[in-house]
């Protein structure tokens, strides 16, 4: 990049003389945060395995038994029902978001598998999946897919601030 303004030696000397008595101010009003570290590179083999897992866990033929009355919800057997209540109340804040608007079922299935794998990799316990309303294809299919995945502990229709009836909050099981 070229400098736009060229100072002559006389102008530079004049500038130095004009600021000679100035003291440096201590900046104490703005907290500077260090930028987040970039994640490690993910091995191509691991990405391929995550894609294979996504197609393995999500079947279009299998129909898990979900409650049809009230909001969409699911809790894996052996998990406390209080977890679903905490999701409903908004006690968990989603750290990752997935928007499925405009995707086909195949694309949505892959993205959902990638989200769950990313949550496990990044140690994210709660995520939000926005399936939208549309023609209700993804709205009906998304809970069926999520109930099949072994790493999903529970999910519930999201509170209004995170999408309401057009989104689901899900809890992911993390390794200790």
UniProtKB/Swiss-Prot annotation:
PROSITE patterns: SMR (PS50828). One of its GO terms (biological process) is rescue of stalled ribosome. It is an enzyme of class 3 (hydrolase). Keywords: Endonuclease, Hydrolase, Nuclease, RNA-binding, rRNA-binding. Its EC number is 3.1.-.-. Residues 98-173 form the Smr domain. SUPFAM superfamilies: SMR domain-like (SSF160443). The keyword tRNA processing does not apply. It comes from the Bacteria. The keyword rRNA-binding applies. Coiled coil: none annotated. One of its GO terms (molecular function) is RNA endonuclease activity. InterPro entries: Smr_dom, Smr_dom_sf, SmrB-like. Associates with collided ribosomes, but not with correctly translating polysomes. HAMAP family: SmrB (MF_01042). Belongs to the SmrB family. Acts as a ribosome collision sensor. Detects stalled/collided disomes (pairs of ribosomes where the leading ribosome is stalled and a second ribosome has collided with it) and endonucleolytically cleaves mRNA at the 5' boundary of the stalled ribosome. Stalled/collided disomes form a new interface (primarily via the 30S subunits) that binds SmrB. Cleaved mRNA becomes available for tmRNA ligation, leading to ribosomal subunit dissociation and rescue of stalled ribosomes. This is Ribosome rescue factor SmrB. The lineage of its organism: Bacteria, Pseudomonadati, Pseudomonadota, Gammaproteobacteria, Enterobacterales.
